[in-house]
Structures are given as structure tokens and as C-alpha cells.
Amino acid sequence: MLTKQQKEEIIKKYQLHESDTGSPEVQIALLTERINRLNEHLQAHKKDFHSRRGLLKMVGQRRKLLNYLKNYDINRYRELIEKLGLRK
């Protein structure tokens, strides 16, 4: 679970302007952080299928947001996946 301070740091890093909290970039960055933390949890607790389902839902949501951003502005999409280290 992200603390309020960690969430604010991620928002500041990826926001497009001063009051931006809901742009696709910010949403994707927050989801990526939550996904990474849940992955660590699932490596320690292999039989936690409840959390695994939540992980799959988050990955699907991130996929939808990435597809939207890719169709809307390909340059912002490429910049974001480079920053987040997605797509090897």
C-alpha cells in the first residue's frame, strides 16, 4: 500500500502541470508502483489468490490507460514507458 507521501512524490514526478493529478501518465505511474509492490508480496505469498486477482485487474487497467495514451499521443506514450522501464 502506498503512503500519502509516496503517492504525492509519484504525482509530482509525472504530472504535466501544477494541479495535474489525473492525467494518464500519473494514473499509469501510480498503478505501476502498486503493481510492483503487489508482485513483491506475491513472491513471498505464492498462494494468495485473492491478491493475484487484484493484480490482474490492475494490470488490465494499466493496459487500457496505456492503449488510450498510445492512440492519443504516441510521443507521450513512448516517453512514459521509457521513464517507467516498461516494454523491454
Curated annotation (Swiss-Prot):
Which biological process terms from the Gene Ontology are attached to this UniProt entry? translation
Any single GO molecular-function term of the entry would be: structural constituent of ribosome
- What SMART domains does its record include? Ribosomal_S15
Does Chloroplast count among this protein's keywords?
no
GO terms for cellular component: cytosolic small ribosomal subunit
By sequence similarity, the record places it as follows:
Belongs to the universal ribosomal protein uS15 family.
PANTHER family found in the cross-reference section: RIBOSOMAL PROTEIN S15, BACTERIAL AND ORGANELLAR (PTHR23321), SMALL RIBOSOMAL SUBUNIT PROTEIN US15M (PTHR23321:SF26)
Subunit info?
Answer: Part of the 30S ribosomal subunit. Forms a bridge to the 50S subunit in the 70S ribosome, contacting the 23S rRNA.
According to its UniProt entry, the function of this protein is described as:
One of the primary rRNA binding proteins, it binds directly to 16S rRNA where it helps nucleate assembly of the platform of the 30S subunit by binding and bridging several RNA helices of the 16S rRNA.
| Protein's name in the database | Small ribosomal subunit protein uS15
Record the organism.
Answer: Caldicellulosiruptor bescii (strain ATCC BAA-1888 / DSM 6725 / KCTC 15123 / Z-1320)
User: Which lineage ranks, top first, belong to the organism behind this chain?
Assistant: Bacteria, Bacillati, Bacillota, Bacillota incertae sedis, Caldicellulosiruptorales
Its encoding gene is what? rpsO
